[in-house]
Amino acid sequence: MEPTITAYEYSDIKQHVNALVSAYLAVNDRHMRSIIRAETIAYVTPFLPEGAPLTQAFLAGLQPDRLSRKEAAKLLPLLEPAVIPFPQFSTKQLGKLFRKVKKLKQPAWASLNLHELTYLGWNDGGSQKKYLVIPDHERFIGIRGDLAPQTIKGVCAICQTIGNVSLFVSTTKTSGLGTYTRNGNYICRDSAQCNRQLTDPQALQDFLAVVRPQR
């Protein structure tokens, strides 16, 4: 089966399923629970591959009148074969995206779920740098920037969620005369968590427009 669900759509589905679980815990009226369940199913169904066995199994799993968080956590991974995974770049491929970095720290690939990644981000605590690989149409853009050591509670410019954010600043060339400017914003310190919260890629593209190198 050809994967058709994007990572941010997968995150959106998960958020709606988790909201359904929360509603089950908060709402005692059986009829109201059935209405909320029907609304959730109606929302997530268009994202799913039509007629696929995993779609049928997933929707069937949403039918019980009470769905626990533990049950939801087991149900959601059923969709992963239908989710487009983020590519696992080789050391050489990453080196081409960050040509000016001599000793590029590699991402901790083993700890990442590629089905959850709309973009790739990892920290180099030794140099206080953060590296981002962001899709841009049919290619990928590598962004290297300074990551402030301080973490605050705030809204992430990428996932638009309140959490632990740090100031990320990149240096970009603004003209052919050698003029440079520093641009950035507050983003999640933990990029894996950021991806799990990202349901709309537009904010990511807006962020890229601010920090990307200018041609």
Predicted regions and their residues:
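General detector of N-terminal leader/presequence modules that precede the first folded domain
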Residues: M1-K96
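Generic hydrophobic, helix-prone segments enriched in Leu/Val/Ile
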Residues: I13, V17, L132, L204-F207
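Generic preference for well-ordered secondary structure
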Residues: M1-T4, Y24, N28, L59, ...
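Sequence-level detector for tyrosine residue identity
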Residues: Y8-Y10, Y24, Y43, Y119, ...
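Generic alpha-helix signal with a bias toward terminal, lower-confidence helices
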Residues: D29, I36, Q56, L79, ...
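Short N-terminal helix-initiation segments at or just after the protein's N-terminus
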Residues: R66-E80, G125-H137, L208-P213
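Long, positively charged binding patches that form subdomain-scale interaction surfaces
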Residues: Q93-G163
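Cys/His-clustered metal-coordination modules, chiefly Zn-binding fingers
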Residues: E138-R215
